[in-house]
Structures are given as structure tokens and as C-alpha cells.
Amino acid sequence: MSKKPWAGRFTQPTDAFVEAFTASIDFDQRLYRYDIQGSMAHARMLSRQGIITGAEAQTIISGLESILADIEKGDFEFSVALEDIHMNIEARLIERIGSVGGKLHTARSRNDQVALDIRLYLRDEVKEVRSFLEKVQESLLEQAERNLGVIMPGYTHLQTAQPILFSHHMMAYYEMFRRDSWRMADIYKRINLLPLGAGALAGTTFPIDREYVAEQLGFDGVTRNSLDSVSDRDFALEFCSAASVVMMHLSRLSEELILWSSADFHFIDLSDAFCTGSSIMPQKKNPDVPELVRGKTGRVYGNLMSLLTVMKALPLAYNKDMQEDKEPLFDTIDTVKGSLKIFADMIAQMSIRADNMREAAARGFSTATDVADYVVRKGIPFRDAHEIVGKTVRYCIEHDKQIEELTLEEFKAFSEHIDSDIYDFITLEASVDSRRATGGTAREAVAREIGRARQERLQRM
């Protein structure tokens, strides 16, 4: 066998810099297990179809098993001269078992081989990402259960809006990560199709059985067009897109944790295990983990744009540009998994300052909407009620009062429809618990959602 699998057509050796520039072994070596797994299934199929003998297939499989063991033990030296993981393994196989190893590549191209490897790899990674999402959801759910009844300010425009339960806030993020898990499950369906058998681009002249290989490798089916099979990276783009949404959710939560842990809010305390100090200011406790996750979100967005840009103008079928699919994909996987793992632990160990949350909720006229709703129930159109309460708030600001501190006489100065029962509607508890409809912040509504989430999780176990 020539050193290069394609060297027969060439009269000059590859320039050393070109060799290094075009090699992908430095990053695609992480696919070794999947490359060997796919090759074993391919060898079994070749034997089953009579394309190679059973003895040859067994020799190939035994050789691949020994190579896998070498790599796992760290006894395999990867070569840049052999370009990629596929040729590194094939060259070692031929070196180990002789020319029969060269029969493995019958009815196969590196184009459909790499498409298979990435799908096998990404299939496992999607499962792992979903398991990390489950852990983040569990941490959020435990915080919601543990702190049911704790009232905090809800915000719009980062201005105090209405009182809500802290548990309601945690369950909002639970829903976000729940959708993320659904997206990953949906993407898995499109990943889990076998591209092997497409050859370089047009299929193969050998009587292969793609469905048998798909069954061997646990795929739901086979891809339907050979050109598309080797040129498709939609599944990787979809993963990077869904991963970007995961990171966006983590980044939003990071921003809130950073604010909440500051001295100005002091709603939460992050465990010391997830914070660092300052080299000059001894009092500092910096929320480095959420800050880094917020920063890494941009990195994952960049990976998505990188992959989209690689694919945007490629004619069918395979092009060398597509070698650039792996680094953004691999980096996205590593970043998302790391971020989810650390967040699950950080949220679980976070402690709540319930008194500070309640105190903040009592400021900023958070029950003003409840006053407006009260006036509406007295028969006043909402827009008129809105103006009445707006004037009431302005009066409170001018006289340095909270709404609940107004006397009945002061209330009546703005509307004769306000009676002494107004005070039953403008406590923080009354405001929160009046929002009982599904999805609302009332304790009974939030408790229902926590229970539903618990039931769903039990059913998935």
C-alpha cells in the first residue's frame, strides 16, 4: 500500500506544509471509537453479502479490536502524514493484519465514512447533553420546592413590576431547559439515519445491504440520496443551533445570578466553591462561573455562524471545506456540556435570602396593578382604572409613601369606588395568590406545576 491511499495518480509527494495544513488528525482523533465501530459493522456486512469471506471479516474485526485497545491504552501514535482518523486506523490495520486489511474499504469512501462517524458520535453526545439538561432541571425543581412561598419582585425592563414567587421564577427556567431537551430529542431523529453506503457521492456497484448495517449500529433507517448523504451537515447545524439556545438560556440565568448575588440585590448567595476572589480587593467574591458561562455563550454562537458559513456556498457533493465542520461542532459540545454540568451543581448549592427578596418586592409599587384590577371590579373601565392608579402612584412618590401606606381617605381622593376592603387586595401574599390560573404565580398554581414536573420526571425514569 502507498503511504497515501490516493498516491497512485500523483508524481510528486505532498508538500510538508500542505500535509500539515490539510491534516485533521489533531482534532478528529476523538472519533476513533466510532470509526472502528462503523468499520466493524461494515466488515460484517461485506462478509454477509459475500463481498469478502467470513474469515477475512473476522481477521479485520480482530485487528480493529486490537487497535481500539491500543488507542484506549495510549499506545497508538497518530500520524499527520496519514491526514485523518480514518487513514490512521486503516494504515495500522493493514500493517497489523496484512493486505486483507485493504479490503475493509470496499464499497466505502471516506466521504460516507466520516458522515457516519460524526452521526455516531453526535448521537451519543446528544444523549449526554440531555442528561446534563435533566440535572439542571432537577436543581431548579429542588430550589422551587424548597422555597415555595418565598416572594420576590418580578421585573420588566429590570424595573419592579409585580410580586411573584421565587419558585415561579425557577420554574420559568425549568420550562426553558425542558424545551431544550425536547429540541435535542427532535434533532436526534434526524441524526439517527445511516449515511454509509453512499460512497463518494453516487453509491456503490457492490451489492451492499445498508439496512443491515443500520440495524447493526442502532440507526432508525438509512439516508435516501447518496449525494445528500455525503454533503449533509444539517444535523450538525441543528445541534449547534439548539446548543446556542441552551447557552442563551444559561446566559440569561447567569445574568440574573450575577445581579442577585451583588450587594445591591443580595437575593442569593452562591457557594464559595463556584466563586473566586480579587488579587487586590480582599472583600471581593466574584461570580466567575456565571460570568464565564455568559461569555462562552458568544463562543457557541460563533461556532454556529462558522459552520453555517462553511456550508453556505458548497456545490454538491463533498468538498474539503467540510473538514472545517468538526472543530466548531466539537467545541460547542464541550462548551455546552461543561456549562450545564457546572450550572447543575451551582444551582443546587445556591442559598436564598428570602427576607431581602420580600423587602425588594415591597418597594417599587409592585401591587399597583392589583389596585387597578380592584377598581375594574368596581365597574370602572380598565383604561380609566389605569389612569387612576397612575395618579395614585405619582402621589405616593411625591409624599414618599408605599401604596399600602395610604389611608382610605387618600385612596378615595383618587376614586370614590375604593373602599376599606382595598387593603385585602394589596398585600404581597394577596397579589401573588390571586393569580391562580394555570401558569400563574399563585402558590397553588406553582405547586401544581412543580407536581406536574415531578410526575413527568417519574414517568421518564
Swiss-Prot record:
Subcellular location: Cytoplasm
GO biological processes: arginine biosynthetic process via ornithine; L-arginine biosynthetic process
EC number per UniProt: 4.3.2.1
Swiss-Prot/TrEMBL keywords: Amino-acid biosynthesis, Arginine biosynthesis, Cytoplasm, Lyase
InterPro entries listed in its UniProt record: Arg_succ_lyase_C, Argininosuccinate_lyase, Fumarase/histidase_N, Fumarate_lyase_CS, Fumarate_lyase_fam, Fumarate_lyase_N, L-Aspartase-like
Keyword Cytoplasm: yes
Matches recorded under Pfam families: ASL_C2, Lyase_1
Pathway stated in the Swiss-Prot or TrEMBL entry: Amino-acid biosynthesis; L-arginine biosynthesis; L-arginine from L-ornithine and carbamoyl phosphate: step 3/3
Catalytic reactions of this protein: 2-(N(omega)-L-arginino)succinate = fumarate + L-arginine
GO cellular component: cytosol
GO molecular function term, any single one: argininosuccinate lyase activity
NCBIfam families in UniProt: argH (TIGR00838)
Family statement: Belongs to the lyase 1 family. Argininosuccinate lyase subfamily.
Name under which the protein is recorded: Argininosuccinate lyase
Upper lineage: Bacteria, Pseudomonadati, Thermodesulfobacteriota, Desulfuromonadia, Desulfuromonadales
Gene that produces this protein: argH
